Amino acid sequence: MATEAIVNDRKEIFGWAMYDWANSAFSTTVGTVFLGPYVASLARTAAEAAGTSTVSFFGIPVAPDSFLPYCISFSVGMQVLVLPILGAIADYSHLRKRMMQIFATIGALATIMMFLLTGGLWWLGGVLFIIANLSFGAAIVFYNAYLPDIASEEERDRVSSYGWAMGYMGGGILLALNLAFFIFSEDIGVPGDLAVRINLASAGLWWIGFAFFTWARLRPRHAAKALPAGETYVSIGFKQLKKTFSEVRHFPETMKFLLAYFLYNDGIQTVIAVAATFAAAPVIQGGLEQDQTTLTAVILMIQFMAFFGALFWGKLAGWIGAKQSVIVSLVIWAGVVIYAYGGLKGDSVTAQFFILGVFIALVMGGSQAISRSLFAQMIPRGKEAEFFAFYEISERGTSWIGPLVFGLANQIFGNLRIAILALIFFFIMGLILLPFVNVQKAIGDAKRYGENNSSGAQV
């Protein structure tokens, strides 16, 4: 039975936000901190043992530091094919919550299996990451699609920011525990590589464990529609997707925003995804190389500061408007990559790295939380999961163009500073496109479309 009329329920909103608390462990402990440097280290060892500068993945020579960025790109390429279909199925059926549960479980189990990464199994790290990241993105489609259902329009900026803030806090707490364990692991007789593997697996346990708070409090939404004769959920998913593509002309401003978001969020997600590899790589010029403890401490600081940053940007959006808030954040992001290219040198490099982290923390949560709530107002009722499937293609940890650009720039120039600077393209494109998005027209188009189709068949 549908419960669409119940909105702004504090218990349900808390349960919804707890999923951000749960799955952010994957983003921080796995995606941002430990997996990239660890897999790159295993791959470098394998390359050195073979007497080459690359490793072979299914016969393809790959630079060790480029391997995981390529895996990110491949996993998102898979999402481009799969997520829109899943979104269409979810909007047609009553399975939104169930599908969220299934993919969260698959992702968590793949993450737990990262404990097995030893010796020459660097390639398994890539395979498990692809499975986990694909599942992470699929579950987030259904999670985001709940936002218009659980929060009224005037509350969405606040609720979206609250979800992101909970994610930063949850991911930060586990990261703090993992950092403490990593620092003192040798003192208690645990080798460093084993400590990393335990930390990776802990993210999967955290993910699946705290997700039960979400399952207990999140209500099923949208009653199922009867399938037409001869149709299955898969076939109707393809047809709904085709219909969505044919109807995008009704939402030109929403599509303009989605294009801008696709570009600038690629930049944001790539900076986050490659930060650990960038800072820890021995080939960085100017003495930037950071040990794992310093690197993790900086990212931990970012996590906790981002909790307050996300809440601040929710307030800022109320003062100057959501679109203007995102534009301000993109200017700061552009400054971050410029400084990563030209700065971070000299005797104070560690202090500079912390200062750069402060600016990242300031904008990281705000640019994403406000983008999500803004997009939620631009889509018609009944098509939330379909539209959020397209949105998720460029969501956190699932960018594909950015990691590909970063990986290719590093492989071509052999310089990670040039690779990080190349990402400024995405922020510049966002700054160019966003001013042309008419937010009020987008909201009006979505409302009129929903009203015109409310008495008809599923839209």
Residues of each region from the PLM?
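Helix-to-loop junctions at the C-terminal end of transmembrane segments
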Residues: 82-95, 308-322, 410
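Cytoplasmic membrane-interface "Motif A"-like loop-to-helix N-cap segments
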Residues: 90-106, 318-332
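Glycine-rich segments within core transmembrane alpha-helices of 12-TM secondary carriers
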Residues: 160-182, 392-402
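Juxtamembrane intracellular "pre-TM" segments in multi-pass secondary transporters
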Residues: 2-13, 219-259, 285, 456-459
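Short amphipathic helix-loop junctions that connect adjacent transmembrane helices
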Residues: 30-65, 273-294
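C-terminal transmembrane helical hairpin of 12-TM major facilitator-type secondary transporters
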Residues: 323-368
